[in-house]
């Protein structure tokens, strides 16, 4: 009977470090809910001590997620562990993940310490975390460059202190698969109490072998794999979880292990992460790239038509990628739209039906026929923008010609007030942005502008993703329409509402802090 490999997702912690703009608490919760649907066993959702915003988002996710174990990261520092526990305590059960460097280089140059002192600190902090939960994970940072005898000493001590999961990270993506498997095997040979903990691995893709290292480690006895959807993460990224999951499924004949992942949710979860994080998936990306199941060679096409298994080791349907259907028009009722969403795997809580149907009718009037990918794009955008808006685009028009100079007129609802402005710009999009900025008074610098087609043909939806810099912080916005200028305007409105909401959250946190201080003074 095969053993289970636990899937530990760190998209919202390690993965987020690769993003140009931080995710809002609402965006993080959307990703967490998608990961829960996919069935990840553990999700690491943040580093609570790093900022009040991260604390709030970890707390929100811990309060909401019920079917996956929620985890937060903490250094081997008392305050880190205490704050992580404070954020997580709203969950029925939770994990604290604490770590310290173990390689000679890190101990000497970063920690300016000794191995004995590192072991003493690790033991103390694991015991401290155990005061809050019996689910404690300990990581040996830079384990890939730690002599295995030193590593064995640290691991044995951490297990004795109460760690139930021991993570062995290849922090800088340096180790070769056969080396990494040797490290795992070496620990099983050297650590007498290793049967009291689950051995986990966390690999990085600096040399392009993160997935290979994780699979080699599983073959050597590791029973938890850490990674991120689409492989996002610091530098070259993390181990791509969808690749590990499907490799274990497809090659169960030699791996002799399994996961409890609902693999039919892989494609949808991948798309959710890509869209929210504003990180397009390369066409040739394994498993979830748009070309992963495409066959252009005549020989291959002929072979696939005769028997798909000639050139396909898995099916698109196995990851939840179904054929595009073409069955909705402006005459389709709410029930038909809802039924199609259900067929694609969406639940009522995944979207607002009123908002979705209104957007569907407007799009159907323009396009005639609405495809599945149109519906999914509309559902995503409406979910992103369903919170109350302080700024709302009421009207815009643009005049431009062969000259570079364009003129835009814009009318916005700002709270209860309607304001209008006009401005010139270097092209229609710049002109609209200049007019919007005049109305709001926000000083924003556009640092990234991406346009992607959602669908096919001349009536395809255009999705605009932008990143702006505002007072040292970066904010992401997304807009969707059949018109590129309208998409661009909607993306800027999304950004401005995100900035406004962030300011409101900051005010609320300051108010709570002030109330706490006032209560202390009263006592």
UniProtKB/Swiss-Prot annotation:
GO terms for cellular component: cytosol. Residues 5-267 form the Pyruvate carboxyltransferase domain. Mn(2+) binds at residues 14, 202, 204, 238. Keywords: Amino-acid biosynthesis, Branched-chain amino acid biosynthesis, Cytoplasm, Leucine biosynthesis, Manganese, Metal-binding, Transferase. Its main location: cytoplasm. InterPro entries: 2-IPM_HCS-like, 2-isopropylmalate_synth_dimer, AIPM/Hcit_synth_CS, Aldolase_TIM, LeuA/HCS_post-cat, LeuA_allosteric_dom_sf, LeuA_bact_synth, PYR_CT. Pathway: Amino-acid biosynthesis; L-leucine biosynthesis; L-leucine from 3-methyl-2-oxobutanoate: step 1/4. It comes from the Bacteria. CDD domains: DRE_TIM_IPMS. Pfam families: HCS_D2, HMGL-like, LeuA_dimer. The keyword Acetylation does not apply. It is found in: Cytoplasm. Homodimer. This is 2-isopropylmalate synthase. It comes from Salmonella paratyphi A (strain AKU_12601). The gene is leuA.
């Amino acid at each position: 009977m095969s053993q289970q490999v636990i899937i530990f997702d760190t998209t919202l912690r390690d993965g987020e470090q690769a993003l140009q703009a931080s995710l809002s608490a609402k965006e993080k919760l959307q990703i967490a809910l998608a990961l829960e649907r996919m069935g990840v066993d553990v999700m690491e959702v943040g580093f609570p001590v790093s900022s009040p915003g991260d604390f709030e988002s970890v707390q929100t996710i811990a309060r909401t997620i019920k079917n996956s174990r929620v985890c937060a990261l903490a250094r081997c520092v008392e305050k880190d562990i205490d704050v992580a526990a404070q954020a997580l305590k709203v969950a029925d059960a939770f994990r604290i993940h604490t770590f310290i460097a173990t390689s000679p280089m890190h101990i000497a140059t970063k920690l300016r310490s000794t191995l004995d002192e590192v072991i003493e600190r690790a033991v103390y902090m694991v015991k401290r975390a155990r005061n809050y939960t019996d689910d404690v994970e300990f990581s040996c940072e830079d384990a890939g460059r730690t002599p295995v005898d030193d590593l064995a000493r640290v691991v044995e001590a951490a297990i004795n202190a109460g760690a139930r999961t021991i993570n062995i990270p290849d922090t800088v993506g340096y180790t070769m698969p056969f080396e990494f498997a040797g490290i795992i095997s070496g620990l099983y040979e050297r650590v007498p109490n290793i049967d009291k903990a689950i051995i986990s691995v966390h690999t990085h893709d600096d040399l392009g072998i993160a997935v290979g290292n994780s699979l080699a480690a599983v073959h050597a006895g590791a029973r938890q794999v850490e990674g991120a959807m689409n492989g996002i993460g610091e530098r070259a990224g993390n181990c791509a979880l969808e690749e590990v999951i499907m490799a274990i499924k497809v090659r169960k004949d030699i791996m002799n292990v399994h996961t409890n992942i609902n693999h039919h949710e892989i494609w949808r979860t991948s798309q959710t992460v890509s869209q929210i994080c504003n990180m397009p998936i390369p066409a040739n990306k394994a498993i979830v790239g748009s070309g992963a199941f495409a066959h252009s060679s005549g020989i291959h096409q002929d072979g696939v038509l005769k028997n798909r298994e000639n050139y396909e080791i898995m099916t698109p349907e196995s990851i939840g990628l179904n054929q595009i259907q073409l069955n909705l028009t402006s005459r389709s009722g709410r029930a038909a739209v809802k039924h199609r969403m259900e067929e694609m795997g969406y639940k009522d809580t995944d979207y607002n039906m009123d908002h979705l149907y209104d957007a569907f009718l407007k799009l159907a009037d323009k396009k005639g026929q609405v495809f599945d990918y149109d519906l999914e794009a509309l559902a995503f955008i409406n979910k992103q923008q369903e919170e109350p808006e302080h700024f709302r685009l009421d009207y815009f028009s643009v005049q431009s010609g062969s000259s570079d100079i364009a003129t835009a007129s814009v009318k916005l609802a700002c709270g209860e007030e309607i304001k209008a402005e006009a401005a010139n710009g270097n092209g229609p999009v710049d002109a609209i942005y200049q007019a919007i900025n005049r109305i709001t008074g926000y000083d924003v610098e556009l640092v990234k502008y991406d346009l992607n087609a959602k669908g096919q043909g001349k009536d395809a939806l255009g999705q605009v993703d932008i990143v702006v810099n505002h007072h040292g912080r970066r904010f992401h916005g997304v807009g969707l329409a059949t018109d590129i200028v309208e998409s661009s305007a909607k993306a800027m409105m999304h950004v401005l509402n995100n900035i406004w909401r962030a300011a409101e959250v900051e005010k609320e946190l300051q108010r709570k802090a002030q109330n706490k201080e006032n209560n202390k003074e009263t006592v």
